Amino acid sequence: MNVIVSNSSDVPLYMQIKEQIKDAILKGELEDGELLPSIRNFANDIQVSVLTIRRVYEELEKEGFAVSQAGRGT
């Protein structure tokens, strides 16, 4: 999954990331049951705060796009 963020955008970083993940899910680029990257690794890969990715994952879960399982990830 290729996520691109822009610090100069008016759209908050977490929303940019969340929308790109949702698009990947809706387009079938991410399959049902496929694990998302760990929060720490994903944050490092796209150079954003761990808190930003945590918020993205929490919102995706609230919206029904992700399920978090203890010990397995999101």
Segments (PLM) and residue ranges:
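N-terminal helix-turn-helix
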Residues: 36-67
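Minor-groove-contacting beta-hairpin "wing" of winged helix-turn-helix DNA-binding domains
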Residues: 38, 72-74
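Residues at secondary-structure transition points
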Residues: 8-12, 16, 51, 63, ...
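Extreme N-terminal segment that seeds HTH/winged-HTH DNA-binding domains in transcriptional regulators
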Residues: 1-35, 41
